[in-house]
Amino acid sequence: MVSLLRCPSSKPYSSLICSLTLGAVVALSGVAYAEETKPAETVPVVTPPKVISQPATKNQVRFTKTGAFDSDTVVKIAKRLAAKPYVALKDPLPAGLAKLSYDEYRDIRFNPTASIWRDQGVPFQMQMFHRGFYFQDLIEIAIVEGQNATHLAYEPKYFTAGEVITQALPNDDIGYSGFRIHNQLNTNGVFDELMVFQGASYFRALGKGNAYGLSSRGLALKTADAEGEEFPIFRAFWVERPYNDSNLIVVHALLDSPSVAGAYTFSVRPGDNTLIDVEATLFPRVELSKVGLAPSTSMFLHSLNGRHDTDDFRPEVHDSDGLLMLNGRGEHLWRPLANPRQLQVSAFSDNSPQGFGLIQRERDYASYQDLEAHYERRPSLWIEPVGNWGQGSVVLTEIPTESEIHDNIVSYWKPRQPIPAGSEFHFAYRMSWGDEPAAKVGAVHVSRSASGRADIAKATPRRLFVVDYQIEGPMTDEMPVAKVEASGGVVTNVVIARNAAKNGYRLAFELEPEDKELIELRAELKFPTPRQVETWLYRWTL
């Protein structure tokens, strides 16, 4: 079984994600971590960092050496890297840092007064993460100004040590484990977290008013594979100094793993929906047949749809509640997520997809009742391919979980043809972090799905499904005709009715599974006057 473990998202101070596969830790670096930020104008009492009297082993700068930089610099480095056999870089930490507990690691905090570009009139600030605990890998960072890059060396002055931390901070350049970008996203004069890069190739971002939820990665390799998943890592970053009057920050990243090296550029524009344009070039060392482009990772524990064996005071618990797709034929598809009893992998074949993404559609606090986690504020993530991505599939992986601390949902685009070894593969896409992209939603779209036992008076294998559709705009006198299809079992009692509470319609039907353990369901509404209507998809399992 594959699972993605993280610290409870209900903790207000942090969220921790570690990647586990087949019951064993395959990439301790596969972690994303973010701690609570403070307003820019707040100047904390700074505890001077303890400094190791005996220097730690000095690590050599491999990628971010100070010197000339242009748009092809990282591509050239990735190409040279891929031409050689993969080398697992070993950059040892002083023993004390390598063995930090979670509480000790969390007590090493970046000093906000040392933020990069602070007091320079720049609309962004940057703070780095310390190495230690699960975050053993050394990540190099450079700051780019004009045509020059300057290596950002580790210095203990960037960090403060609280009372819990008993280990001294080193005085040598041990690098970092990642960084986060701050912006006046929500309030003028207050620099809130906007985006985090930390752990393998994980990153995540926020739209206005959001709280951290799902994550993305640079690349997915061998997801849910019996041999174990491979986790590429961003080994180095080059962050361009933003212009003082700009709403854009650009980050370049070098990706590496046993199978592939690559160069990425992230152009980030914060807003109600934060937009990130991604340009990537891959240089495979081996043929990539089990590759996922634009992968997203999320959590779904329970909702009104699916299993009802969770003893929880909260009606719903999830970072995302559905996979939205706009395929190459212009069809809008909505697939509610599930927490299955067994690992499930679904592939939605397509040609030149227009978009897909894990969406948090339910935005009502009453649906979650969680005063700490506030799942209603978790961002949706919409992926819009740039150019023709050709034939392939949107892949959805749903992993059983008994707790919200596990990220158990993965989605990505899988090209139909493998990417050959020794080739140079380019792709690009736009990410939208925030509310659901309204322009990509059908004029008649699914607002809610629920299911339960068809006969509440006695036990029965028959299932009742209820799908609510909402109309954008005023209701009309037209009544649609419902078409429900199932890959097995028998569908009965299909009923469509007006639903004034949702300014739309309610579709209800029953499913008799018979002897089936897995059934694919598809529901469509047909109007006398053609309309853009979402197609509802669902995989029922025992």
Swiss-Prot record:
* Gene Ontology terms: cellular component: outer membrane-bounded periplasmic space
| InterPro entries on file | Gal_mutarotase_sf_dom, GH-type_carb-bd, Glucan_biosyn_MdoG/MdoD, Glucan_biosyn_MdoG_C, Ig-like_fold, Ig_E-set, MdoG_OpgG
Pathway listed for it?
Glycan metabolism; osmoregulated periplasmic glucan (OPG) biosynthesis
Q: Where in the cell is it found?
A: Periplasm
Q: Does the keyword Signal apply?
A: yes
Source species, domain of life: Bacteria
Alphabetically, which GO biological process terms does the record hold?
A: beta-glucan biosynthetic process
Give yes or no: UniProt keyword Lyase. no
Q: Where is the signal peptide?
A: 1-34
Keywords attached to this entry: Periplasm, Signal
* Gene Ontology terms, MF aspect: carbohydrate binding; catalytic activity
Main location (coarse class): periplasm
Q: What does this protein do?
A: Involved in the biosynthesis of osmoregulated periplasmic glucans (OPGs).
Q: Which family, according to UniProt?
A: Belongs to the OpgD/OpgG family.
Q: HAMAP family annotated for this entry?
A: MdoG_OpgG
Name of this chain's protein: Glucans biosynthesis protein G
The record lists the organism as Shewanella baltica (strain OS155 / ATCC BAA-1091)
